[in-house]
């Protein structure tokens, strides 16, 4: 059913199939979509009018989110931002909802050896890649307050554009440059969390892949040498044969296309749902279809405890043109200077 809904959202299928999907989904989803839109607008208006008061942190808050459901490449942008700010001498911290994790309490501080079972995959990935303080909580303001105890001077939120209970200074929206906004309908009739009008209010639009449109900063994900999930050994993907590829991300075909662009044709491509938990038995069985199992870095953080010696992941880095990157970092630094010292 999920696959059919995605086909309906993003189209580009034979007319007969699209007609069938319209007949199936419009009567059920249209009223729900209208209700979703009404509730979303009403909730945001309450914070804009002051009926509800958002938590304002004593340091700048930067939100990296999107207006569509699913993965658009937000986490690589968060990692990029953290690394750029660290290079400038700032001390960023990251907050996340911790989707897919079940921590014993909230807020919860992510450490180097924290399990994804507790906090989800993205927070663990961000912590291991950057070394920055990361805290998770469904109530993001609680996570922010925890990070303030760890000497941070900028807060970056991984997702949370629609979490208006947390006041923010700068907003990023990451756009899937290939799929864009689908049929431009609100959930569940389409993939939108908010209407496209919302894009006019954000500070930076980042287009992940595809052709960037007006006012969008182009970005692509640059893969590097494979890393062995178990040993940390590095090698070129072209050194491996009979690869089985797997991806448990928002849009698995993006990862499989990356492998093709690297000149690799997997013997099998296995998509999984985003944030899916994996078992050792399941992945061992999958790997037996070839000689090597290749996955995303986001999947790898969930497999370290039981990884086999023929399991590899492809690390990727967000690449943004220098002119856009300079404008982004200078804007954050300017806001930081306006705040002054968090201890002042």
From Swiss-Prot:
Residue ranges of coiled coil: none
Annotated signal peptide: none
Protein EC: 2.7.1.130
Superkingdom: Bacteria
Pathway annotation from the record: Glycolipid biosynthesis; lipid IV(A) biosynthesis; lipid IV(A) from (3R)-3-hydroxytetradecanoyl-[acyl-carrier-protein] and UDP-N-acetyl-alpha-D-glucosamine: step 6/6
Disulfide linkage: none
Protein name: Tetraacyldisaccharide 4'-kinase
Organism in which the protein naturally occurs: Photobacterium profundum (strain SS9)
Gene that encodes it: lpxK
């Amino acid at each position: 059913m999920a696959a059919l809904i995605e086909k309906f959202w993003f189209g580009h299928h034979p007319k007969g199939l699209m007609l069938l999907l319209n007949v199936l989904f419009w009567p059920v989803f249209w009223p729900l979509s209208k209700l979703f839109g009404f509730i979303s607008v009403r909730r945001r208006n309450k914070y804009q009018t002051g009926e509800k008061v958002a938590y304002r942190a004593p340091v700048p808050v930067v939100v990296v989110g999107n207006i569509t459901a699913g993965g658009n490449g937000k986490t690589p942008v968060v990692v990029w931002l953290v690394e750029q700010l660290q290079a400038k001498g700032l001390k960023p911290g990251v907050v996340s909802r911790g989707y897919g994790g079940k921590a014993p309490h909230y807020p919860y501080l992510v450490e180097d050896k924290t399990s994804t079972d507790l906090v989800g995959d993205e927070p663990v990935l961000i912590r291991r890649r950057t070394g920055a303080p990361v805290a998770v909580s469904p109530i993001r303001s609680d996570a922010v307050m925890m990070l303030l105890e760890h000497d941070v001077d900028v807060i970056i939120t991984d997702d949370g554009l629609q979490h208006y209970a947390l006041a923010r200074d700068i907003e990023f929206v990451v756009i899937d440059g290939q799929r864009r906004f689908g049929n431009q309908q609100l959930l569940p009739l389409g993939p939108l969390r908010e209407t496209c009008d919302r894009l006019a209010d954000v500070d930076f639009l980042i287009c992940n892949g595809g052709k960037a449109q007006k006012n969008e900063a182009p970005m692509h994900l640059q893969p590097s040498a494979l890393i062995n999930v178990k040993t940390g050994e590095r090698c070129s993907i072209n050194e491996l044969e009979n690869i089985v590829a797997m991806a448990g991300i928002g849009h698995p075909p993006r990862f499989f296309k990356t492998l093709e662009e690297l000149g690799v044709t997997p013997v099998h491509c296995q998509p999984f749902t985003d944030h899916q938990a994996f078992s050792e038995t399941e992945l061992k069985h999958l790997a037996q279809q070839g000689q090597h199992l290749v996955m995303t870095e986001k999947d790898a953080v969930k497999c370290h405890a039981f990884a086999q010696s023929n399991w590899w992941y492809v690390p990727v880095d967000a690449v943004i043109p220098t002119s856009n990157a300079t404008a982004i970092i200078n804007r954050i630094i300017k806001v930081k200077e306006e705040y002054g010292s968090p201890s002042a």
